[in-house]
């Protein structure tokens, strides 16, 4: 059996990079010749990519005979950011640029502007675009962003929580949606002891997302996704002061609801370990959408949790 992955035809474009390398490749694989096209993108932010890329590769272990549409995969959209496990590329001048804010890009701009300019045509000829973010090197997430007109796509992805996507100027999915493309933004997974659980769950979600529009034919329809909990606008909880962050709730809690007053974690003084800040769940039902699951040193103002109320 030849798999979709084994059938991918790899292509690349070369983008001006740092002095030692001169050019950085953007590689993408394509399979299928006719029908509805889905483009799956991982690593728009360099600290989020590996888990999402693995989920896409898991999807691609299906037999190529099951591919009834066309598939394009970009496993690492932002290579210079990925190699240092940072959100953005380190060579933009004079300031770092968020790739997910500059679409459709500028081929005469900074490195990231140019990168967006080369990715944009790989989006514009698609019927479905799924931008997989996830948690990353420092957090774990459990939600998908839903766009008007693409509600079923978001539901099929099977995240514990669904939030309405903001209209983010320059965003990859915002750009795709402006072209009439079905889109979803996945924020599921990240570094934790459960990273493979979330990776496999994302792969199952991608199966459903490609089965519904007829891109992937399976011997039997995939199991329906568990109904996600709709949540209201998300709220960021940040560190009021820098120090040592010690989580009370660990990775098993992301994607669940905890009651008001639940201790979530605390910040200790870097020098004396005195308790400086305690995070507690503020709502009667507090949806845990993003969290730091590990002990770490953080700066004041650092994002620690993303929470919401069930809608």
Task: Say what each PLM segment does.
Residues 1-311:
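Structured catalytic-domain cores with a bias toward divalent-metal coordination
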């Amino acid at each position: 059996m030849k798999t979709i992955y084994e059938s991918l035809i790899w292509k690349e474009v070369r983008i001006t990079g740092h002095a030692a390398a001169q050019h950085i490749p953007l590689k993408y694989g394509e399979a299928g010749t006719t029908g509805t096209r889905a483009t799956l993108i991982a690593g728009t932010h360099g600290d989020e990519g590996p888990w999402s890329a693995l989920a896409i590769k898991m999807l691609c272990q299906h037999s190529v005979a099951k591919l009834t549409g066309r598939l394009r995969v970009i496993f690492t959209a932002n290579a210079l950011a990925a190699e240092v496990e940072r959100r953005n590329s380190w060579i933009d001048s004079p300031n770092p640029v968020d790739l997910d804010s500059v679409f459709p890009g500028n081929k005469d701009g900074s490195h990231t502007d140019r990168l967006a300019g080369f990715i944009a045509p790989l989006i514009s000829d698609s019927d479905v675009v799924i931008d997989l973010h996830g948690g990353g090197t420092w957090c774990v997430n459990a939600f998908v962003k839903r766009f008007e007109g693409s509600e079923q796509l978001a539901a099929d992805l099977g995240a514990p929580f669904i939030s309405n996507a903001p209209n983010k100027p320059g965003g990859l999915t915002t750009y795709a949606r402006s072209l009439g493309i079905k889109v979803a933004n996945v924020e599921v997974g990240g570094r934790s002891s459960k990273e493979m659980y979330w990776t496999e769950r994302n792969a199952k979600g991608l199966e459903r997302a490609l089965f519904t529009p007829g891109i992937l034919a399976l011997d039997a329809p995939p199991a329906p996704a568990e109904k996600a909990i709709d949540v209201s606008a998300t709220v960021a909880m940040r560190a009021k002061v820098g120090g040592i962050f010690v989580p009370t709730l660990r990775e098993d809690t992301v994607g669940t609801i905890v009651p008001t007053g639940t201790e979530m974690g605390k910040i200790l003084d870097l020098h004396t370990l005195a308790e400086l800040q305690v995070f507690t769940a503020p709502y009667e039902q507090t949806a845990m959408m993003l969290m730091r699951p590990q002990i770490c040193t953080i700066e004041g103002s650092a994002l620690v949790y993303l929470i919401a109320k069930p809608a």
